[in-house]
Amino acid sequence: PNDRPRPPTKGSPSDSPLFNRAVQGVYELGSTFKIFAAAQALEIGLANPSTLIDADAPMRWGKYTIKEFEGHNYGPLISLTDVIVKSSNVGTAHVALQIGEKRQQEFLKALGFFEPTKVELFEAPYAKPLTPKNWSDIHTITISYGHGLSASPLHLAAAYASLTNGGTKVTPTLVKQAYRIPGPRIVSEETSAAARA
């Protein structure tokens, strides 16, 4: 079953019915990433759910302008909870800048966004997320709201599970197990509970 022939037609491999989009496809995952910046801010003590965050749009960063979807302006200040509820790009960007480039990378790495998933599928080792070569402040900003880093839907599901299952790393598996051995701690149980709220 793993000696699959190449599709008989020309074109992109991702057009093949044999291409596993959930595992092999890497995409910019957009606003689904915002929860990671908020959770990290909670975890490292930068904010609590009611901390007021600058959400005045648009935000200028050097030659770049960060806008909200459909031109909304949620500012000048909204709570960290509302940054997630309203899906504020600007609010998330401000949170990410407080976290900083290095801590953001470490957190996303702990969640599994720098390596292929370890699921027991032939194609899994070939689906490594795409990350910036030179991670700058603008990458820190855009990655916080899901642009500039591409990962598979399975990466996202595993990261969400790790964040919301009590805060320990979840490794996807197809093997039925009598019980799950918890992975390394990613966030505290308190942060995990806040992310679920």
Give the residues covered by each predicted segment.
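Beta-lactam-recognizing serine transpeptidase/beta-lactamase-like catalytic domain environment
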Residues: P1-S31, F36-A197
